[in-house]
Amino acid sequence: MNEHLAFAQCLQRVLNETELTATEVARRLEMRSRNSIFRILKGKTSPQLNRRFLENFHKHMGEQLTEAQWAALNRALEMDAVGAVEYKSRQALMQLVGAFSEPISPAKVCYLDALGAEKEDSFLHYLQVLFCGALKVNALLFGCCDLGLFRQLQEAIHPVAQRVIVRIDHFIYAGEDEIVSNLVGIQPMVDQPCYHAYLVDAENCPQERLAHYRTGQMTFHVMHQDGSESTVALFLLGKNEFTATVMSTQDLWMSRKVLCDRERFSPIRLLWQLNDENSDFIVYTQQYCKMEHGAAIYYIRPDVPFQYIPLEVLYPVVREGFARMGMTREAYEPNVTALAEIHQARMTNMMRRRRPTYIVLNKAAMEEFVRTGRQSDHLHFLRNFTPKERKQILDVLVQQARKNPFFHLYFAQEKLPCTMGEVALYDGRALITMSSGSGYDLRTDHRESCITHPFVLRAYKQFYMNTVVARLADTQTESLNQLEELVRRCEKMIREGQKGNAGNEQEKLSGQ
């Protein structure tokens, strides 16, 4: 969990680290009075004045500080300008879309061993020991929403997932000062089958238990292979530091009560319960068709969305896919017909609705699609699209970008990778994240993070327009030019393929 300091505090820390005095800095910067820098250190100056000071500081003493120290000062300055809550939310959303990654410091756990001696271990190794020899682990989490912790939690669970039954219930406070960074912090675990998260709304939570939900705590109840059971609670003391306490059965009364609250709170992801894969996929696409209808949509994704593939291209390929799976035409045709109707409705909605659609794509991923005919989330039973089909798909995007005033297409700059998967905001309805490579295979317990909290939706929309579109993407004109270049590559591949086919025919005639 990374610390956020005001500019005055950050500057004082940097001066202490570099053993520079305020007097020395004032002299080197030729400031009229030492009082000016003392006012900055006391936090009595505006962000604008602090910005001018920092630029002058860098100009005259740039070599005195490390890159990390300059970065910390700039972050502190930005936080002062926009406020701590908005800054933390913005940084969290930058992490969500893959445009920013803070260094993660390993967490540690302090505990008493069997002899009562104080011990210290890394958070990751402590969990690995906890899971070793376990048959079943039930975990109850309150707060602790941090990317570093959750990456380590994922790393601890992954090796034992096949032999240990793990269930994690996580209660997350949904206050506006925490909700955005909290939901980003849990992303490493949100698509894991064992993980179940709930948003705790103060209005729907018993007041006597609300304080409990806001603590930083992880409780693990372990059933061991020898038949014994044990429970340990980790309490977050401060930055990246837990203390561990062994709990008795009597201590678990609050845990049992909070589990009863699960029905009060909204889960933050979709879970596709499978009865039949094909019919469930129809329900899945129907839900998206309904969510897209009449909504402004803000996409970030690697390449062409499934729903933007023209029906005349997609459904011959779908039929081929079902046939290759061994299904008869009589078996698959009802599903194909139902999917075709929904897909056409989605295409029509995209082209005709008078609400804006923004889509930011990754150029390298689009180039890969042109080369291979395969999307990052290619439907798992489909063959790759041919060069001709690829051109037809891109032609739809070009036509929309040229002629539809409500359709806005961008290519991301390098600082926005767009390779982690899809992040899609359906304005006022939901913010959905999905990892690349799922193939929409619902048999694999397909999951997507689905956030409906109004504050998060508003914060993400503002972030998308003010940061993603304004600062992290090429202009629409530049992006359209790049898209048209990809179309020309498809045309070249088609011509080269035709020449190759003509050459093969000539060889056959010569052989005769």
Regions inferred by a protein language model and the residue ranges of each:
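A short, Lys/Arg-rich alpha-helix, primarily the initiator
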Residues: 1-22, 27-28
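Short amphipathic recognition helices of helix-turn-helix/homeodomain-type DNA-binding modules
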Residues: 1-4, 8, 49-107
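Cationic-aromatic interfacial patches
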Residues: 2, 13, 31, 221, ...
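DNA-recognition alpha helix
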Residues: 24-30, 58-62
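Recognition helix of helix-turn-helix/homeodomain-like DNA-binding domains
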Residues: 30-49, 73
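Extended, compositionally biased accessory segments flanking or bridging domains
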Residues: 93-136
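Hydrophobic protein-protein interaction segments
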Residues: 118-473
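Charge-biased C-terminal accessory regions appended to nucleic-acid-, cytoskeletal NTPase
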Residues: 459-512
